Amino acid sequence: MLALAFALFRVSRARCFSLVGEAICHVDTDQPLVALTLDDGPTADGTPWALSTLRRYRVHATFFLIGASAAGQEKLVQQILADGNEVGNHSFTHVRMVGHSAGFYDSEIMRTDAALRQAGVQDLHLFRPPYGKKLIGLPRALARHDYRLIMWDVEDSSGAATPQAYAAEVVRQARPGSIILMHVMYRGDRIAQAALPLVLQGLKARGFPIVTVGELLRYRRSVPPH
């Protein structure tokens, strides 16, 4: 039992594997493209700052938004869209999506879907699980609601103490088809916030155009059979 529990724990946090359906952590492409994803929010401080930074570098990103945060922050969601960015579903309450009932998963997905559509989002088909956690119930719910499970293959996992170190780690890991995860929405994300311009500069210096997840998927070389 202990071995089984450990195996399930590892699967639940695996970035590029899902017991049900497909977990997209990287896109097989012959184009030198990377996708930038920004998780959480929207927040009154972090979102305008992130949008300003993206505009400065003429870059679009995919914002995975929390439903409870988006409700009441419709203008921020609309500004994300107006700037040409993409919006994805990041659950309603930002809890770990493991060990719940089918109804719970459906509610988390569809309450967020409703909040985002109320703010003007029309094309909703990308879902990122909070903390990257998933087993069987969540992927099944995503399939029921025609969502794709989007993970990532690049993040700062080194606990960088400076924006320069953070950016260097992210830029070093990037390769064609990478999906980059950053958290820049909250006060506790100061290092990542300061690193964002450095990441954009570093990726550009390496010759990587930065796109949304949806754009990256359009350059996918092959789609695995379902």
Would you name each region that the model predicts?
Residues 65-70, 93-96, 133, 155-158, ...:
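Short histidine/acidic/glycine/proline-rich micro-motifs that form metal-
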Residues 78, 105-109, 163-168, 194-197:
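Charged helix-capping and loop-helix junction motifs
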Residues 51-60, 64, 85-86, 95, ...:
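CE4/NodB-like, metal-dependent polysaccharide N-deacetylase domain
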Residues 133-173, 207-219:
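His/Asp/Glu-enriched short active-site or ligand-binding loop at hydrolase and phosphoryl-transfer sites
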Residues 10-100, 104, 108-118, 209, ...:
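Active-site beta->alpha N-cap acidic-glycine motif
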Residues 172-214:
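Catalytic grooves of carbohydrate-active enzymes
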Residues 1-7:
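Hydrophobic membrane-insertion alpha-helices, especially the h-region
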